[in-house]
Amino acid sequence: MSVRLRFAPSPTGNVHIGNIRAAIFNWLYARHCGGTFLLRVEDTDLERSTPEAIRTLKEVMAWLGLNYDEPEMYQTSQKDRHLAAAGKLVAAGAAYRHAKGGEGGGEAILFRLPWDAEQCPGVAVAGPCEIEIHAGTEVVVDKTGINFAMPSAKGTPMPVQKCLAGFQNLTVLDAEGTVLFSLNDVIAEVLAGKRREVIAGAVKFRFTRRTITYHDLVKGDLTKPLDSLSDFVIVRSDGSPVFHLGNVVDDVTQQITHIVRGDDHVENTYRHIFMFHALGAAVPLYAHLPMIVNAQGKPYSKRDGDAYVGDFRTKGFLPHTLLNYLALLGWSPGDDREKMTRDELVAAFSLERVKSSAAQMDIRKLTDLNGQYIAELPPAEFVKIAHGWAVAQPWGAGLDAAEFAKVCGVMQIRTKTFADIAGWGFFFTDLPAYDEKTCAKQFKDKPIQDALVMLGEEFATIPADVFTAATIEAVIHGITAACGIQQGKLNQPLRVAVTGTTVGAGIYETIELLGKGRTLPRLEHAARFF
């Protein structure tokens, strides 16, 4: 059977890198296996899942090249199917209606973890179990489960409600060991909602513990005792389906074979396995991805820096850079490659090589990778993209195409993101902006001041047609020696004098690009800061 995977986000506006990484992993695995990749929009939150939010999601996926193979499914369009499934579960005894806590007096529908849980894949008997409960709290047993209290460290009651299925062969005992209640004796009536028991004076539960285990393709075997689970709402009292119902029914409808999602869904999976079984459907394979964290090991968020795909797009990251980086954030191809083409990623990808530990976001590493990809762009493509960014700048109107191409030729290998182009203004304006503190620091020594004045005088004598990097370098070396300045020590003050910045391309190439006509007035202007 061909693999079928889905990306099922709840679009609420900006697309977090954690969500889009899940999409990337689903897409890569589907393409690696020659399977099907689907987009399912879980748009049941009508206030937040606006048309604009959905449009943003689809634009982000298109920008990253995450194409899907069938028309997208909108969860709201499946409501009738969801409610029909809930009705079948109720009819089969796998769910029940309950009015307690219902809004406006309506009935909610809860999924019941099955009393005959061993029929469900992954459920096993762990053995006899005994737990102490809070002696001063009554035990209530009804169709919704078992309500009791556990004692806190200070001895105070901590109320809990757990599913009936978690307490096979339950007996409730008092302090003398007398059996006050046996669940097996009344289980049929309790499940049918015809019996409710209230037991006072209980101090201990004895029961047969059962567990549910599933194999996670990333985390390995994961196990949970049934007595830690509760029945859960699948249809609210207002008639709207809950996430659990819609998610599982849609997976059945779309014949999903592999569910790849964040590890915040690990706990949901135990519940969903029971639902697949109750619906008579095969249980998909699961892979839960590690969380993306900051340097402190906490969930990566906007407080830590750029966290949304749109942030990186507007700051001039290439789409493949982000795809490449996020694919390797929590996954390894099995070697030391950090730059991989789309085809290489598809060929190498496997869920078995996804790491189970949290993945740390490193903006500097991502930025450096983007710089490498920018450096490899064909020059004409770089000029085209860079021009689009340049014309949006205050200095970008009326750029000379030939002059701009020359600047691109020098700056391409030094560009980390296309947002860096905002700092190219000094190439195209008469005078750059000068920072007084920077000038004061760079121009404070008298030999530097003298050298800058002498450079202006010497540059003035050079014919424009030989105002080249080689000629400029020779002049600078000569004046550096004449002023008793150590070789290289003049370059930074000179850069500030002619560009207003402390970073950029080689100073000789920069001055050649500026030309004699822009360089001389800048040296003269810089002298005002001496």
Feature names for model-found ranges:
Residues 75, 96-288, 293-298, 333:
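Active-site cores that bind ATP or allylic diphosphates and position pyrophosphate for catalysis
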Residues 267, 279-434, 499-530:
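Catalytic adenosine-cofactor/nucleotide-binding cores of aminoacyl-tRNA synthetases and other
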Residues 1-10, 36-40, 47-48, 56, ...:
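Basic, alpha-helical terminal appendages of large translation-related enzymes
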